[in-house]
Amino acid sequence: MEEPQKSYVNTMDLERDEPLKSTGPQISVSEFSCHCCYDILVNPTTLNCGHSFCRHCLALWWASSKKTECPECREKWEGFPKVSILLRDAIEKLFPDAIRLRFEDIQQNNDIVQSLAAFQKYGNDQIPLAPNTGRANQQMGGGFFSGVLTALTGVAVVLLVYHWSSRESEHDLLVHKAVAKWTAEEVVLWLEQLGPWASLYRERFLSERVNGRLLLTLTEEEFSKTPYTIENSSHRRAILMELERVKALGVKPPQNLWEYKAVNPGRSLFLLYALKSSPRLSLLYLYLFDYTDTFLPFIHTICPLQEDSSGEDIVTKLLDLKEPTWKQWREFLVKYSFLPYQLIAEFAWDWLEVHYWTSRFLIINAMLLSVLELFSFWRIWSRSELKTVPQRMWSHFWKVSTQGLFVAMFWPLIPQFVCNCLFYWALYFNPIINIDLVVKELRRLETQVL
């Protein structure tokens, strides 16, 4: 009976001599260790998966990886992880000396202090400002983005109803009507769309009741004589050049966005989405496969010659296009390489007098896309991932190519109504979505650890 008592007393003496290891026969520091630093847990934070880590270890992991996932099992956590109060109090009571030493080391490490501050700021942005506002935030349906989607849904319904009601008028456009069947009013409409200068001759054409058949027979000499009396040689040349295009096509060539969409629904949808997601590849495609009809007017609009900067309107300037000069190519290539979305914004700016609101939507969207692209480059630079740029470029090229081929294969099967919905969504709704993306990037930049 005496020997067991002695062994028990010896065990208690050993525990008093080594208080950092255990306070009982079966509890040691190793059982409360963090799987990141392999030291005792300080402010233990338990994730949704059940794993616990030191809060500063979790903050360092988040700052370096920018991922909201468990460092051990890689399961994503939901919400913002909090300190396990029960586990923290138990560890502090069992191992007070060890916790005190760890706290002193942590407070002396500036990197850890900054990471904890950034991590907490990130958490404050994720949770409601006050407990009483939790239910109100849920009723708001997710905040700003939910409100945006609600507004977009209402606007989408209005636009789709408008498109449905005006569907017949789209087929009555002059781009679908043979020239020989034009009335005198339609001839005047065609003339006025050449530019503001053409309104000078409106009454002369109306008084003579020039219809489509008569228009096809007019020559340059007749335009210069009574009753038309077009004395300005550049005006006569512009009218004759456009008349030659009308004779060659048999219909009026498209001169604005809606006429272009009516004649080329597939190409307009392709250009809208391609220039939005991959402007550099899209412009390269236009240069290789659609040089005369699309690329040449585009480069002359965004990089005009100095002698072209006269009072002529945009339609008149695009009637007779020559090969770009080296100066135009230099200006284009610089913008193409560094600011591709600026090219789209400049093109839309030149069409403001024709498409007042639509051009403004395009300009705003181009600016937002430029900012988002800048954020992408900043992330690559800050994470030292420049070596991955070639791989990213190849992946992007492969993704865009496969998507384009997929759409081209199934294009005949896609209803026109669906194409119109996609077109209006990308044209008017995408800028509002990009505003929300820019706001999120700015918030993320605030919490980024430098």
Swiss-Prot record:
Pfam families: SAM_1 (PF00536), zf-C3HC4_4 (PF15227). GO terms for molecular function: caspase binding; protein-macromolecule adaptor activity; ubiquitin protein ligase activity; zinc ion binding. Residues 182-249 form the SAM domain. Residues 1-140, 353-360, 426-450 are cytoplasmic. It catalyses: S-ubiquitinyl-[E2 ubiquitin-conjugating enzyme]-L-cysteine + [acceptor protein]-L-lysine = [E2 ubiquitin-conjugating enzyme]-L-cysteine + N(6)-ubiquitinyl-[acceptor protein]-L-lysine. Mediates RING-dependent self-ubiquitination leading to proteasomal degradation. Interacts with CASP8, BCL2 and BCL2L1 through SAM domain and also with HIP1, IFT57, ESRRBL1 and BCAP31. Interacts with NGFR; this interaction inhibits NF-kappa-B and JNK-related signaling pathways. PANTHER family: BIFUNCTIONAL APOPTOSIS REGULATOR (PTHR15898:SF13). Membrane-bound E3 ubiquitin ligase that plays a role in several processes including apoptosis regulation or reticulum endoplasmic stress. Has anti-apoptotic activity, both for apoptosis triggered via death-receptors and via mitochondrial factors. Contributes to the dynamic control of IRE1/ERN1 signaling during ER stress by inducing BAX inhibitor 1/TMBIM6 proteasomal degradation. Promotes the activation of TGF-beta signaling by mediating the 'Lys-63'-linked ubiquitination of TGFBR1 which is critical to activate the pathway. This is Bifunctional apoptosis regulator. It comes from Homo sapiens (Human). The lineage of its organism: Eukaryota, Metazoa, Chordata, Craniata, Vertebrata. The gene is BFAR.
